[in-house]
Amino acid sequence: MPHVVPITADFAVARALRTEDFEVVAAQGFRTIINFLPDGETQFQVSAADARRLCEKAGMAYAHVPAQKYGVFTDGVVMAARQALASLQSPVLAYCASGQRAAIVWAAAKSQSMPVDAVLATLTSAGFDFGYIRDDLEQQADRPRWQPAGGSADQSPIEQPAA
């Protein structure tokens, strides 16, 4: 059973899910899974294609937003995360190797619509000490003012469950 860390009432993070975890988190009430692991990052991880199939089987929506460990603040990752968070049903469980990257990407996405102090306070309440990313979050908060209209969104990673 995965160790789930709630960030908000509608969003939680976890370490990489195993095959047997998908049914468990669906039974816990999660409606969407966001996978921030690039395929092949860890030796025994569930592939993105298998994770999608497991989500479909469990009746959950799925988004794969591969975020390299040192690439969490890239336009494509942040925009895809924002899109997934805005359009998919909650509650959402996001995962990566440890859960920290998922929390950081959430913070980057939320900092464009929520004060950075509030984002960091929310993370602190959940047990994460991410004060060291304040400058990165401040840059994300300023993006809407200087990013070109339409941004640089990559192709949508969002996959809905099969009907």
Question: Where in this protein do the model-derived segments appear?
Answer:
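Cys-dependent protein tyrosine phosphatase-like superfamily
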Residues: 1-92, 107-163
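A phosphate-binding catalytic loop at a beta-strand-loop-alpha-helix junction
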Residues: 92-103
